[in-house]
């Protein structure tokens, strides 16, 4: 994998099925750490994440902010709130702002344009990353022309049948992938990603994820363990494995050597040193 940067489907399944072997996981982590340090040195990239809304029109079965969750404590930040976060972040040394929210129709496309332009006016040296779900290609283009640099849209699973078990029928796995290709075509630096250990996922599904990422060639890949959320159909499902998530980070680093690979929030949620373990296994963003 380190040499060829891809595997055949059956090779992936064999490798992923061996995740229970601690020596194999440690070997993969050591190789991935060497690759990461060879490409990036010991630098870790720090991002300022602003979660500005947890309203969402979608009803994904795993997500705590799904529209049908009556227990979600909803909030929205104003443009002034967000700009205040950016000001504080800039003073602290953040140079990338990640604006993340649910697919919330309260904010119009024009509002995003104004926000992006204002952040860029105040902090012309910053990078703006958006993570606000599936939109039209025209909307993506408008935001890019306003100054947005990057876009994060997790594909969640590359297996279409698996996708349909985690989302209501009005959501399309094909459309989600089309959004990622449209974002790349427009010129964004693009991030995709998936949950590790989601219900119904096995080596076959993870193999398809690795193949899709190899084909897409994203600039960033965000993965994290599945964490059951209260008030969702998957609330009582088993949490994703820390060991498998760390292993997947290592394999991603070996396949996509120059990709930006975060040690995500969910890793820190399931283990107090989860993020540090992710960095030791090839991640390079927090």
What are the residue ranges of the model-derived segments?
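Conserved, mostly hydrophobic/aromatic
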Residues: 4, 32, 60, 99, ...
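Core AdoMet radical
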Residues: 67-82, 89-110, 115-116, 120-180, ...
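Conserved C-terminal portion of the radical SAM core fold
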Residues: 123, 155, 174-234, 242-262, ...
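Catalytic cores of alpha/beta
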Residues: 136-145, 199-213, 268-281
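Canonical Radical SAM [4Fe-4S] cluster-binding loop centered on the CxxxCxxC motif
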Residues: 41-81
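Generic structural signal for well-ordered alpha-helices
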Residues: 48, 86, 113-117, 140, ...
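C-terminal accessory regions of radical SAM enzymes
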Residues: 1, 7-13, 19, 39, ...
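Flexible, acidic/Gly-rich N-terminal and inter-domain linker regions that tether
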Residues: 1-58
